[in-house]
Amino acid sequence: MAQKSGLKVTRKYTTPGNPYNNIEWEKRSSKITNPDGSVVFEMNDVEIPSTWSQVATDIMVSKYFRKAGVPQTDADGNVLKDENGDVVLGPETSSRQVFDRLAETWRHWGEKTGYFATKADAQSFEDELKYMLATQMAAPNSPQWFNTGLNFKYDLTGPAQGFWYVDPKTGKLTPGEDSYSRPQPHACFIQSIDDDLVNEGGIMDL
């Protein structure tokens, strides 16, 4: 019987269950000021791993927390609703939400495109990444922090931004329908050039 292909992910830092089990969290405030003391940004009672510096906290909260469109929850994790029964929306308030939307979205697309050998391997992949993000062992580039998971976790869309993707079913280049279901989460691109400084096909053509 042929062995199923796909990635097999061995756990190094986590055990099945809660990937954040050994991480201590604390509530902090993030405040960024100008040299004259005027406040540029401030957000209180945000949840951050206790090992993070204040600089890392400020970057995470001010730059990478989604500031709108996120379902708000109570202390027990229950979604809050207003008097009309509509879900109360607001910002992300915990770095755990950010780690979750990144790792769970990566896992989702990996499973959807057949990357993993088993569901257990997909879960290991997700859990290990959550732990590595929370402990600062790994971090993606800024477009990932900004965009990844906003549609998958929060159903956010937004107007199309001119992004294109290859439809895996048809193999054809297809325009994206909105901002976040297939976002542009990359900051750098590799382009082929000749080893030449000034002539055609060289670095100046970029």
List PLM regions with ranges:
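Extended catalytic cores of very large enzyme megasubunits
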Residues: 1-206
